[in-house]
């Protein structure tokens, strides 16, 4: 998943 989530 994207790291900002």
From Swiss-Prot:
The modification Leucine amide is found at residue 5. Its main location: secreted. Keywords: Amidation, Amphibian defense peptide, Secreted. Expressed by the skin glands. It is found in: Secreted. The keyword Secreted applies. Signal peptide: none annotated. GO terms for biological process: defense response. One of its GO terms (cellular component) is extracellular region. Belongs to the frog skin active peptide (FSAP) family. Tryptophillin subfamily. This is Tryptophyllin-5.1. It comes from Pithecopus hypochondrialis (Orange-legged leaf frog). The lineage of its organism: Eukaryota, Metazoa, Chordata, Craniata, Vertebrata.
